[in-house]
UniProtKB/Swiss-Prot annotation:
Classification lineage: Eukaryota, Metazoa, Chordata, Craniata, Vertebrata
Gene source species: Bos taurus (Bovine)
Domain of life: Eukaryota
Motif (Involved in the stabilization of the negatively charged intermediate by the formation of the oxyanion hole): 111-113
A Pfam family reported for this protein in Swiss-Prot or TrEMBL: Abhydrolase_3
GO cellular component: endoplasmic reticulum membrane
EC number of this enzyme: 3.1.1.3
Protein known as: Arylacetamide deacetylase
Active-site residues (renumbered): S189, D343, H373
UniProt keyword annotation of Disulfide bond present: yes
Topology Lumenal: residue spans: 26-399
Subcellular localization(s) per the UniProt record: Endoplasmic reticulum membrane; Microsome membrane
Length: 399
């Protein structure tokens, strides 16, 4: 009997050691973050093991594991929910049950997942869209798009743009009872990247007459030029989104060729002839002083021109919205940006805030202290719940 108890004790110690990860002092409910990280870490290990054995691609396995979050379209007494397609792109629509004679606000939402997994039917996305539709009395469109590694850039951008452009057709807006003067776009992480890129593209499309009233970018990924930002240095090994995982997301967005990932990890993937673009992502001039924290800017080492020729997407503004010239930013709508303290993507958002402000765009920046990447998806945490409410309240006041 004593041996059995001793065995359980050893097992408990090992399990606690596997779950425990040191976290900063200002992180609320650290055990919730540790348990979440344990699930993500275990999924990652299993996916990597399967890839090493040649059973499945890492991202395909991660997408498979994440499907446990899938939630069918379920209407309730307040919101009608249904799945349909906009010009063959799958979307989930949320429409308030209450009848109204006036037109409603419209929000077009793009999910995250590193362009490799994620879906509008994940429980956290479904719940956030449902809350948004109910509290704003708005029509919410939550779109899907084809994913890497099966599909690479610009497929994801094109899918989202196709769905949004269909929605913005005046006849389609009328059929859903949406006010053409009160439409916003929103996205988180990779979805924030797509939202920013799509908002820029709309300004150049003569076929689209409807103007967005707001854009909300939730811890967006906005550039693949420099992976040596202070946020990448400080948060490289924190839970949810490590530097190595984010770099893999970026490389898979363009190709399954591992040589690109290797070059990105060493920050040697941008050719000399494109060095003029670094001014758009130079954190030494774009980050607020309090986020520099004594970090020294290192001029990136230039990479092979062959990589850029094989994968021109790495230089495309549709993939990296921070590469847009100031003149292209000036027409963008009122913008709300969320960044998180412990997130490798923090500085992408901070730099975009600075560039938008310098271009005359009105920007509201909500920096969430003590939060990790993906916090709005973690509505079971206090910080995630607060951030979601702040996001919805801002939309209520400005959309």
């Amino acid at each position: 009997m004593r041996k059995k108890y001793f065995g359980f004790l050893i097992l408990g110690v090992l399990l606690a050691g596997y779950i425990y990860v040191p976290l900063p002092d200002n992180v609320e409910e650290p055990w919730k973050i540790m348990l979440l990280n344990t699930f993500l870490k275990t999924s990652s290990y299993l996916a990597l093991f399967g890839e090493i054995l040649g059973l499945n691609h890492f991202m395909k396995s991660m997408a498979l594991f994440s499907r446990i979050q899938g939630f069918p379209p379920t209407s309730d007494e307040n919101i009608i929910v249904k799945d349909t397609t906009f010009n063959d792109i799958p979307v989930r629509i949320y429409v308030p049950q209450q009848k109204t004679k006036s037109l409603r606000r419209g929000l077009f939402y793009i999910h995250g997942g590193g362009w490799c997994f994620g879906s509008n039917d994940y429980y956290s996305y479904d719940l956030l869209s449902r809350w948004t539709a109910e509290r704003l009395d708005a029509v919410v469109i939550s779109t899907n798009y084809r994913l890497a590694p099966k599909y690479h850039f610009p497929v994801q951008f094109e899918d989202v743009y196709t769905a949004l452009k269909w929605f913005l057709d005046p006849q389609n807006l009328e059929s859903y009872g949406v006010d053409p003067g009160r439409i916003g776009i929103s996205g988180d992480s990779a979805g924030g990247n797509l939202a920013a890129a799509v908002a820029q593209q709309l300004l150049e499309d003569p076929d689209v007459k409807i103007k967005l009233k707001v854009q909300t970018l939730i811890y967006p990924a906005l550039q693949n030029f420099d992976f040596d930002l202070p946020s990448y240095r400080e948060n490289a090994h924190y839970p949810v989104l490590s530097k190595s995982l984010m770099v893999r997301f970026w490389s898979e967005y363009f190709t399954t060729d591992r040589s690109l990932k290797k070059a990105m990890l060493s920050n040697q993937h941008i050719p000399l002839e494109s060095s003029n673009l670094f001014k758009f992502v130079n954190w030494s001039s774009l980050l607020p002083e309090k986020f520099k924290k004594g970090h020294i800017y290192k001029t990136p080492t230039h990479g092979s021109s062959e990589l850029a020729k094989k994968y021109p997407g790495i230089l495309d503004v549709k993939a990296s919205p921070l590469l847009a010239d100031d003149s292209k930013l000036r027409g963008l709508p009122l913008t709300y940006v969320i960044t998180c303290q412990y997130d490798v993507l923090r500085d992408d958002g901070l730099m975009y805030v600075t560039r938008l402000q310098k271009s005359g765009v009105q920007v509201i920046h909500n920096h969430v202290e003590g939060a990790f990447h993906g916090t709005l998806a973690f509505l079971f945490t206090k910080v995630g719940y607060r951030a979601a409410n702040q996001y919805i309240n801002w939309l209520h006041e400005n959309l």
